[in-house]
């Protein structure tokens, strides 16, 4: 039986650390790899699945840079009041649920809602977010191979060269999209794994490296959350110091944003 975690109070905001040029230079000279961007994706199962308390517990546990949700109801929008951060919801036409994104830092640009080829019953949309370094599409695709592939073609046509498509793919076989690789975890993600192992939740990526991935334990939903750590593939010919300075700036920016809303830094 699932026991919802107790209420979580918002921590006192703290001052974001100043980013001094000397800090950037020191970190750049270390020339480590660009920091991986942590994305968690979870199908919440509408009203009968994960509640806002379960989503809060996931945020507190995983500290994602971006949380993607499918079958999110209007009630999930209270995340901003409960844990801070930034939230965008794209309801499916005529439905009580839709797609949602949460981030501890401001979205570089507002997420776009894109209409998809749809079946007779459910009209599908996807959310597209441009992070600057790469694009992210949050999807809950239709059953049926032909319609599924048409939806994927529509989605990737509007994505930048570096991009990731995450969410509930609703397919059992391979998701074939030219130029994209399936970089998500390989373990089953659906509750029917005792009967039939289904890997419905996936991440396809282009121009990105997946540093790590995982399937998280099951909660009250029939889907398990998936986690991927993505970073852009290095550009040929870019000076090492410039790569290091960009990576250092990104690390310090995220640390400052997390300090403002009281989340722990997962890289520490």
Regions from the PLM with identified roles:
Residues 2, 127, 199, 221-229:
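Structured catalytic cores of enzymes that bind and process phosphorylated ligands/cofactors
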Residues 2-25, 29, 48, 66-134, ...:
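Structured beta-strand-rich core segments of catalytic domains in phosphoester-bond hydrolases
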Residues 95-110, 131, 195-210, 230-232:
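Conserved beta strand-loop-helix elements of the APE1-like EEP
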Residues 37-44, 55-77, 136-139, 155-178, ...:
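Active-site beta-strand/loop signature of hydrolases that rely on acidic residues for catalysis
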Residues 145-212, 217-218, 239-268:
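Metal-dependent phosphoesterases centered on the DNase I-like endonuclease/exonuclease/phosphatase
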Residues 1-81, 233-268:
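N-terminal, active-site-proximal structural segment of metallo-dependent hydrolase catalytic domains
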Residues 118-159:
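Internal catalytic-core helix/loop-beta-alpha segment
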Residues 42-49, 114-118, 140-145:
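Short, flexible loop segments at the rims of nucleotide/cofactor-binding pockets, characterized by
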